[in-house]
């Protein structure tokens, strides 16, 4: 069973439909799941507050080797903190912080390419430079070698190259929304389901 963590925000139906999972905020269901999906939209601090009662269950699942997929804000929550909510710690699964885009139009909304930097089972059968759908104002700056995909965001004469996918052991996360990314997104979710 795949547990799609319900934090009371965002439309989780498309993620659940693509994965055949169960939408839940029950710690026992999350603990008993074979895989966990941590989706998210909204404010880093507000969502971390809702996630706090599940922190231990999620960290234990990761330490037990269960595959976890973070989506959009779910990727950001896996880092140590965010400029969006100073002083509010993230899950700290990955070292590094989340910063706001500077010099480019915010938010970054629309289709953009993901360039694969390392092999990762999430991207099996997906062409390098494939397009995915993004909606975000912040991005992660990892302080360790976990980046498996990057994206170039150009606007207003400026360019930011940011980490759009990370992977280490059984923890995977993407800044884009695979559930809104057509065939490429469905393939990525299927790859996660088959891990």
Swiss-Prot record:
Biological process (GO) annotations held by this record are: L-histidine biosynthetic process
Matching InterPro entries, A to Z? Answer: Class_I_gatase-like (IPR029062), GATASE (IPR017926), Imidazole-glycPsynth_HisH (IPR010139)
Which residues does UniProt mark as catalytic? 72, 177, 179
Report the GO molecular function annotations.
Answer: glutaminase activity; imidazoleglycerol-phosphate synthase activity; lyase activity
From the UniProt record, give the pathway where this protein acts. Answer: Amino-acid biosynthesis; L-histidine biosynthesis; L-histidine from 5-phospho-alpha-D-ribose 1-diphosphate: step 5/9
What does UniProt give as GO cellular component?
Answer: cytoplasm
Recorded catalytic reaction(s): these are: 5-[(5-phospho-1-deoxy-D-ribulos-1-ylimino)methylamino]-1-(5-phospho-beta-D-ribosyl)imidazole-4-carboxamide + L-glutamine = D-erythro-1-(imidazol-4-yl)glycerol 3-phosphate + 5-amino-1-(5-phospho-beta-D-ribosyl)imidazole-4-carboxamide + L-glutamate + H(+); L-glutamine + H2O = L-glutamate + NH4(+)
Name the domain of life this protein comes from.
Archaea
Q: What is its EC number?
A: 4.3.2.10, 3.5.1.2
HAMAP family, alphabetized = HisH (MF_00278)
Subunit structure and binding partners: Heterodimer of HisH and HisF.
What's the protein called, per UniProt?
A: Imidazole glycerol phosphate synthase subunit HisH
Origin species = Thermococcus kodakarensis (strain ATCC BAA-918 / JCM 12380 / KOD1) (Pyrococcus kodakaraensis (strain KOD1))
Q: What gene codes for this chain?
A: hisH
